[in-house]
Amino acid sequence: MAAKQVLFSDEARAKMLDGVNTLANAVKVTLGPKGRNVVLDKSFGAPTITKDGVSVAKEIELEDKFENMGAQIVKEVASKTADVAGDGTTTATVLAQALLTEGLKAVTAGMNPMDLKRGIDKATARLVEELKALSKPCSDPKSIEQVGTISANSDATVGKLIADAMAKVGKEGVITVEEGKGFEDELDVVEGMQFDRGYLSPYFATNQENMTTDLENPYILIVDKKISNIRDLLPILEGVSKSGRALLIIAEDVESEALATLVVNNMRGVVKVCAVKAPGFGDRRKAMLEDIATLTGATFVSEDLSMKLEETNMEHLGTASRVQVTKDNTTIIDGAGEKEAIAKRINVIKANIAEANSDYDREKLQERLAKLSGGVAVIKVGAVTEAEMKEKKDRVDDALHATRAAVEEGIVAGGGVALIRAQKALDGLTGENDDQNHGIALLRKAIEAPLRQIVSNAGGESSVVVNQVKANQGNYGYNAANDTYGDMVEMGILDPTKVTRSALQHAASIAGLMITTEAMIGEIKEAAPAMPMGGGMGGMPGMM
């Protein structure tokens, strides 16, 4: 086992604070509308230019073991805030640095670290209650657009794209962000349910120009096994042929003989049909087929449910107003399923999301939820260079997460104003002793740090601005983008309550733990062994 170095009390805390300051100073330059960019070196390819706090934090690894411990702990604040709220990482880092700096001064002065932490925890709980009281719901498109704009570094086009996407697919719909192929940002909306399986044969295509199959008001058969014998399908095919309508078959697979028969009948015009493979794999495939059955009003034909394909008839088929199939995707629009059954299915998926253990499972369940509840929107980010594309995509991702957080828990005045207004909730709050009171006072002062940093990044005098904001009430604050004061909500400067709350809670939690640290243990870096002497080159025969 490698030898360890142990640092105690003030020496340990000083090293830890140095690491925190290194990370926080790199992250906090990005805060606010006039925050600067940070350039990140990559082991391959061009450097990345970003204004995203968590991206900067994730890149930082310090040479000194003990300083690095401090930096990694605060990195956790940024990552946790990003995971929970999707934004507010820089605010959380600035709060943690401010709390820790003042907290360690108090510990050095002889105060009890545990009582300081209890005071901070007590004040945090009161501030969270006050933030919730200050919060206003965010449901109208204008507020959604404003939140998206602020989170995307005051880019109004991004705010509008997100508001449009939410208007089209609903607030719980799936919105994804992709790299576009042009210079302009685009919004693509896929209505209805789409899954990533196309037709099993190009001979099913009805439109030869763009190789798509368009089925109007088709019947839909959903089977979870391979179809190998065409005889099993004969009762269905005869019924569909008599009705004069089309048929979409969704099955695990259709084997060559049965597929050839379907293609021939389709080309001769006996029955208009298209077969596609079922989406997903294993248990997820069955769940997705049940979703499609619910959406279209079909009966899910599965031997697990004691149903055989040869026993099916026209009553087991679902319908939709339109189906479009390409070589890669199938889109079912306006399925004829009962609204009650769809709502019940949606509630089951929501319950599964709440119980999901892994991010992957949760993501797949959310995709299923969106497909059942209204569609998928894709924001395609446009840019001139690849570096700009990556930077912009990060900003759009942040803005999307922040907007979702705003819809979930509401909004408060932005620009650090909500935390300043929440200060009044601490007026009558006292701890059990002087050290706890000092912990409360620490947090009261620390929550001014985000506003101070926004002003500092804009080139202003932070103390003057903070005093001016404190002297007024309500949503009155400082707009760093154009150096003016006014109502932050009217100016469209909003923060999601969830983002501000998460930043505060995570910063207070980590700062409390670091203040109460008394020892640090790290491996001693061993000197690398000296390189061996290189062997001499042997003489070559025939050389003079």
Swiss-Prot record:
Keywords (A to Z) from UniProt: ATP-binding, Chaperone, Cytoplasm, Isomerase, Nucleotide-binding
Localization, UniProt: Cytoplasm
GO biological process: protein refolding
Main location: cytoplasm
Catalytic activity annotation: ATP + H2O + a folded polypeptide = ADP + phosphate + an unfolded polypeptide
EC number(s) stated in the UniProt entry for this protein: 5.6.1.7
Binding residue positions for ATP: 30-33, 51, 87-91, 415, 479-481, 495
Alphabetical list of SUPFAM superfamilies matching this protein: GroEL apical domain-like, GroEL equatorial domain-like, GroEL-intermediate domain like
Stated family: Belongs to the chaperonin (HSP60) family.
HAMAP family found in the cross-reference section: CH60
Subunit structure: Forms a cylinder of 14 subunits composed of two heptameric rings stacked back-to-back. Interacts with the co-chaperonin GroES.
The protein's name: Chaperonin GroEL
Organism field: Francisella tularensis subsp. holarctica (strain LVS)
Gene designation: groEL
